[in-house]
Amino acid sequence: MSVQGPRLVLDIRALTPNLRRPLIMCLVDHLLGSDATETIVVISDHEPAGLGYQLELRRETRGRVGFSYDQRLDGAWVALISLKP
């Protein structure tokens, strides 16, 4: 998993669970609305498969973002949300 170009790193491990997903969606929506090209790197303490599923289901983001994730050696999960042009 590699990131090329500008990236925004968001470590959500210290946030309460009820704030995590809304914060990520708000950030993705804002960047999509501003024609940004950053890749969002989300660091989490659990597998983020549900986040990718939600991005595909949402009307606002469906087909407009790429999503992949992997687990680091230290146990943290890293998800990449890439904005499609």
Feature-to-residue mapping (PLM):
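A generic structural signal for short, non-catalytic loop/turn and secondary-structure boundary residues
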Residues: 3-5, 60-62, 72-74
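A residue-level signal for beta-strand positions that form part of recognition/binding surfaces
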Residues: 9, 39, 78
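C-terminal edge-of-domain segments
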Residues: 64-85
